[in-house]
Amino acid sequence: MGEPQRPLAVSLGDPAGIGPEIIVHAWRMRDSANLAPFAVAGGANVLRSATEALGVPCPIQEIDDIAEANSAFLEALPVIKGLDGAYLPGAPDPIGAKLALKSLEMATRLATAGHASGVVTAPIAKGLLEQVGFTHPGQTEFLAAACGLPEDASVMMLAGPSLRAVPLTVHCPLAEVPGLLSIGLIVERGRIVASALQRDFGIERPRLAVTGLNPHAGEDGKFGNEEQDVIAPAIAELLADGITATGPHPADALFSPHSRAGFDAALCMYHDQALIPVKALDFDQGVNVTLGLPIVRTSPDHGTAFDIAGRGTAHPGAMVFALLMAGECAARRADA
């Protein structure tokens, strides 16, 4: 019999947001959702307070070592000692942001050191993190840097039960997208996506569908030349590499049930082109997966939701799916 899988490390997220409560709910769903064991990087007091506010049973067990999580997980939510703070739902401040950052750093260290099988990150508020010294555009770029990679070496994929989609450009003004797209960018990220679908998702021959940038995928240059000058040559290069890739597809027709059956992931030209269909189809189960890292990382595809924090109305589905996906990806890597 092989060794048990190492636990996942879960960051607390901003303690004023919905992170603590969706973590509590996820632990309570551990059996029905068949979740792998996980431990939270600090915040025992925050999680106890969240449990009390929710009025649900969730015993908290503080542990010294994440290895203890496997045995503790069945009976209690394991929380690693060393970090804590106050639970003030809906009242974000720099103190809470600093706790969120320290928790993210701890969870990441556990994964990069090989003690955790992967990282699942709860939502943060980037503006507040910047006030306490966070210098990265987001958690994705932070994790790449923590793994010793350039910030642009990782790829963000949004995934749910119905669709996987990758925005090739992310947090930038829409007006800048045409200038940011290049054959090299599309090819490099297409290779990362294809490799990750094989390694982490068990898809032997991944099929990539590549969108156009312009309406009707440019309609032979009538509405723009990016499809002819950039996107089609990139697809040809991916095909030459042995990667199954089709397109450029008009984005408005790509996400129907019939079309989705023909590909494993969509490469989209900009943020909303990828995120709108994922959130429309799988809003309560959408997961942000970071591809191209030596560690597994997932996150629920939603924000801190300060406006509903502490009310008991936050849906835990995306956190549950993020934990489930991280556990499955980690298991595939362990078996490889």
Curated annotation (Swiss-Prot):
Catalysed reactions, semicolon-separated: 4-(phosphooxy)-L-threonine + NAD(+) = 3-amino-2-oxopropyl phosphate + CO2 + NADH
The protein's required cofactors: Zn(2+); Mg(2+); Co(2+)
Keyword hit for NAD: yes
Keyword field: Cobalt, Cytoplasm, Magnesium, Metal-binding, NAD, NADP, Oxidoreductase, Pyridoxine biosynthesis, Zinc
One of the GO biological process terms: pyridoxine biosynthetic process
GO molecular function: 4-hydroxythreonine-4-phosphate dehydrogenase activity; cobalt ion binding; magnesium ion binding; NAD binding; zinc ion binding
UniProt feature coiled coil, ranges: none
UniProt cofactor note: Binds 1 divalent metal cation per subunit. Can use ions such as Zn(2+), Mg(2+) or Co(2+).
Its EC number(s): 1.1.1.262
List of residues binding a divalent metal cation: H171, H216, H271
Subcellular location: Cytoplasm
Pathway assigned to this chain's UniProt record: Cofactor biosynthesis; pyridoxine 5'-phosphate biosynthesis; pyridoxine 5'-phosphate from D-erythrose 4-phosphate: step 4/5
Keyword Iron appears in the UniProt entry: no
Short name of any one Pfam family annotated for the protein: PdxA
SUPFAM superfamilies, per database record: Isocitrate/Isopropylmalate dehydrogenase-like
GO cellular component: cytoplasm
HAMAP family from the UniProt entry: PdxA
Functional note: Catalyzes the NAD(P)-dependent oxidation of 4-(phosphooxy)-L-threonine (HTP) into 2-amino-3-oxo-4-(phosphooxy)butyric acid which spontaneously decarboxylates to form 3-amino-2-oxopropyl phosphate (AHAP).
Entry's family note: Belongs to the PdxA family.
NCBIfam families per UniProt: pdxA, PRK05312.1
Additional observations: The active site is located at the dimer interface.
Binding partners and assembly: Homodimer.
PANTHER family named in the record: 4-HYDROXYTHREONINE-4-PHOSPHATE DEHYDROGENASE, D-THREONATE 4-PHOSPHATE DEHYDROGENASE
Record's protein name: 4-hydroxythreonine-4-phosphate dehydrogenase
